[in-house]
C-alpha cells in the first residue's frame, strides 16, 4: 500500500469523514460571502450593485480557483491543507479588515471585490483537490466515480445550505458580523486540522505535516484572538467613523445603531447615516410634523421615526392619539433609554401605540384593524438600497393614502433638495402618481443636514401653513413655512417617472447625487 491508497474498511471511513469535512468547508465558504453581503448592507447600503458584485464575483472566482489549482494537483494533500489554512484565515478576518478599511479610508468597493475574489478562488480549488485525493486513494473506480462525484457535490451543496442557515439564525444574531465571520473561520480551520491529523497525516512527509499543523494552529490562534478581543478592535475602528465619542453602539438584526455625544450635542446614527443632532433636530422635526396637521387632526400614524422626536411634537396636542410603526425594536429600546432626554419619554406615553413591524407589510395586511388617520408622517432613512426603496415606491404611497381620512395629510421626508434634487423631485412625482390630490414640496435649512426637503400631500387646495392652535415653536413660523415652499431658478419642480417596486429609480437618484456632490 502506498500514496493515498487505503484498506477497504478504512476507505469507507476516510470517505465519509472527508465528505463531512467538505460540508463544513462549504458552509464556512458561504458564511464568508454572507458576512460580506451583511457588511456591505451595514456600511454602504448594500444595494443591488454590491450584492450582485459579491454573488457574481464569487461564482466567477470559483471557476478561476478550479483553473489556478491545476498545477498543484500533483500535491493534493499539501495543497488542500494550504488552501484551507488561507481560506479560514482570509475568510475569518474579511469582515474585520473591511470594517477597519472603511473606518480609515471610507467606502472602498475594490476591497469588497478583492475579498470576494480571494475567498471564491480558494473555495473553487477545494473540489478539484478532493477529487484528486479520492481518485489517487482508489476510493472510486471507473464504475463508481460518477456516484462519488454526485455525493461530493451533494455534501458541498448541503454544507452551503447549513452555512446559509447558520449565518442569519445563529452567527449574526449571537456573535455579530466580525466575530461571526471569525467563528466560521475557526470552524473551517478546525475541520482542516482534523483532516490533516486524521486523514492525511500518513500521506505527508513529517516535515511538511508539522509545517501544515503549525500553520493551522497559528491561524486558529489569530482568529481566537479576534473572537476574544474583537469588541475592543471594532470599538477603536468604529470611533474613526464618528467625529464625537461613541457612547452606545449595537448591531441589531436590522442595522448598526450608534449614539455619539460631545457636550450637549447627542447624535443618532443608523448604518452610519446621521438621523439627528440635538443641536438642530428641532428644525427638522418641526418642519416634518406641523405642516401635516389640519385644524381637526386628532389621530396620527408615524412610519419610522423610532427616535420618538416626531411623537414628542405631536403629543403637545393633548387630544392627539398616535400609532407608531417602527421596524427595529432595538431602536425603540434606545429611544426609551439613551434618547429619553431628547424625546421626553414620548414612546412611553399611553397615547402612543408602538408597533414593531415592516411598514409595507403592516399597511398591506390592514394593521391596526385598517384604522384611518388624520395625519401620516413618513420619517425614514434615505432610500440608499432596494429594501428601503420599497418604502419610497408608488405602491407604498398608495397603501398609505388608503389609510388617510378625508381631508387628511401626509408628510414624507425627502432627502436633500440641493444635494440630491432628483430624489427630492422623484418622491414628489411618485406621490402624485400614487393619487395625492396635491403635492407641495418644501425645504428648510438644517445645519447638520444642509438644505433638507419634505413633501406635503393633501386634498386639492391644500396649502402650507400652521394650524390655529399650534404651540410656541423654536424654529417654524408661518413666514418660514411660506419661504420653505419657494425654490431657486436652479432647482425648479420637474416631472419624473415614479419610483416603483419593479423599478426603484430613487436608489440610483440618491447614488448619483452623492457622486456628483463628491466631485
Curated annotation (Swiss-Prot):
Cited Gene3D superfamilies: Vaccinia Virus protein VP39 (3.40.50.150)
EC number: 2.5.1.16
Residues at which spermidine binds: 307
Single GO MF annotation: thermospermine synthase activity
Keyword field contains Transmembrane: yes
One annotated GO biological process: spermidine biosynthetic process
Biological pathway: Amine and polyamine biosynthesis; spermidine biosynthesis; spermidine from putrescine: step 1/1
Regions crossing the membrane: 17-37, 53-73, 86-106, 109-129, 158-178, 180-200, 208-228
Subcellular location: Cell membrane
Membrane-topology descriptor: Multi-pass membrane protein
Record-linked SUPFAM superfamilies: MFS general substrate transporter (SSF103473), S-adenosyl-L-methionine-dependent methyltransferases (SSF53335)
Active site: 379
GO CC field: plasma membrane
CDD domains per the UniProt record, alphabetical: AdoMet_MTases (cd02440)
Residues annotated for S-methyl-5'-thioadenosine binding in this entry: 255, 326, 358-359
The protein's enzyme class: transferase
Organism domain of life: Bacteria
Catalytic activity: S-adenosyl 3-(methylsulfanyl)propylamine + putrescine = S-methyl-5'-thioadenosine + spermidine + H(+)
Keywords for the protein's UniProt record, in alphabetical order: Cell membrane, Membrane, Polyamine biosynthesis, Spermidine biosynthesis, Transferase, Transmembrane, Transmembrane helix
Family that this chain belongs to: Belongs to the spermidine/spermine synthase family.
Function of the molecule: Catalyzes the irreversible transfer of a propylamine group from the amino donor S-adenosylmethioninamine (decarboxy-AdoMet) to putrescine (1,4-diaminobutane) to yield spermidine.
Alphabetical list of NCBIfam families matching this protein: MFS_SpdSyn (NF037959), PRK03612.1 (NF002956)
Protein name: Polyamine aminopropyltransferase
Origin organism lineage: Bacteria, Bacillati, Actinomycetota, Actinomycetes, Mycobacteriales
Amino acid at each position: 500500500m502506498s500514496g493515498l491508497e487505503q484498506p477497504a474498511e478504512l476507505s469507507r471511513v476516510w470517505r465519509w469523514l472527508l465528505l463531512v469535512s467538505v460540508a463544513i468547508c462549504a458552509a464556512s465558504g458561504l458564511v464568508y460571502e454572507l458576512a460580506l453581503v451583511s457588511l456591505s448592507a451595514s456600511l454602504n447600503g448594500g444595494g443591488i450593485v454590491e450584492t450582485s458584485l459579491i454573488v457574481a464575483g464569487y461564482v466567477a472566482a470559483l471557476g478561476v480557483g478550479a483553473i489556478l489549482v491545476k498545477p498543484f494537483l500533483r500535491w493534493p494533500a499539501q495543497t488542500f491543507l494550504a488552501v484551507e489554512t488561507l481560506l479560514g484565515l482570509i475568510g475569518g478576518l474579511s469582515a474585520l479588515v473591511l470594517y477597519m478599511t472603511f473606518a480609515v479610508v471610507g467606502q472602498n468597493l475594490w476591497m469588497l471585490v478583492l475579498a470576494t475574489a480571494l475567498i471564491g478562488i480558494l473555495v473553487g480549488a477545494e473540489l478539484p483537490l478532493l477529487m484528486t485525493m479520492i481518485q489517487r486513494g482508489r476510493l472510486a473506480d471507473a464504475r463508481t466515480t460518477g456516484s462519488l462525484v454526485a455525493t461530493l457535490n451533494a455534501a458541498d451543496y448541503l454544507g452551503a445550505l447549513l452555512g446559509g442557515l447558520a449565518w442569519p439564525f445563529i452567527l449574526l444574531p449571537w456573535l455579530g458580523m466580525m466575530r461571526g465571520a471569525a467563528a466560521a473561520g475557526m470552524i473551517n480551520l478546525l475541520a482542516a486540522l482534523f483532516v490533516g491529523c486524521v486523514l492525511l497525516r500518513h500521506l505527508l512527509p513529517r516535515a511538511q505535516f508539522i509545517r501544515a499543523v503549525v500553520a493551522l494552529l497559528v491561524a486558529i490562534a489569530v482568529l481566537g484572538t479576534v473572537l476574544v478581543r474583537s469588541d475592543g478592535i471594532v470599538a477603536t475602528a468604529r470611533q474613526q467613523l464618528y467625529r464625537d465619542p461613541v457612547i452606545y453602539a449595537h448591531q441589531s438584526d436590522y442595522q448598526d445603531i450608534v449614539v455619539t455625544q460631545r457636550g450637549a450635542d447627542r447624535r443618532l446614527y443608523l448604518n452610519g447615516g446621521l438621523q439627528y443632532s440635538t443641536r438642530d433636530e428641532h428644525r427638522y422635526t418641526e418642519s416634518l410634523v406641523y405642516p401635516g396637521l389640519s385644524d381637526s387632526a386628532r389621530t396620527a400614524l408615524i412610519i419610522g421615526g423610532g427616535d420618538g422626536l416626531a411623537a414628542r411634537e405631536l403629543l403637545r396636542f393633548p387630544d392627539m392619539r398616535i400609532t407608531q410603526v417602527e421596524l427595529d425594536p432595538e431602536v425603540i429600546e434606545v429611544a426609551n433609554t439613551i434618547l429619553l432626554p431628547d424625546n421626553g419619554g414620548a414612546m412611553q406615553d399611553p397615547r402612543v401605540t408602538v408597533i414593531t413591524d415592516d411598514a409595507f407589510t403592516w399597511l398591506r395586511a390592514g394593521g391596526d384593524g385598517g384604522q384611518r388617520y388624520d395625519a401620516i408622517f413618513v420619517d425614514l432613512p434615505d432610500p440608499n438600497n432596494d429594501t428601503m426603496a420599497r418604502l419610497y415606491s408608488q405602491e407604498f404611497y398608495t397603501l398609505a393614502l388608503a389609510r388617510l381620512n378625508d381631508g387628511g395629510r401626509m408628510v414624507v421626508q425627502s432627502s436633500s433638495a440641493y444635494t440630491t434634487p432628483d430624489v427630492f423631485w422623484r418622491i414628489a412625482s411618485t406621490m402624485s402618481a400614487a393619487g395625492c390630490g396635491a403635492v407641495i414640496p418644501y425645504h428648510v435649512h438644517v445645519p447638520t443636514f444642509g438644505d433638507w426637503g419634505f413633501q406635503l400631500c393633501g386634498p386639492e387646495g391644500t396649502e402650507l401653513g400652521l394650524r390655529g392652535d399650534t404651540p410656541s415653536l423654536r424654529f417654524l413660523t408661518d413666514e418660514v413655512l411660506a419661504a420653505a415652499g419657494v425654490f431657486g431658478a436652479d432647482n425648479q419642480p420637474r416631472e419624473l417617472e415614479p419610483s416603483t417596486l419593479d423599478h426603484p429609480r430613487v436608489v440610483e437618484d440618491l447614488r448619483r447625487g452623492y457622486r456628483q456632490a463628491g466631485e
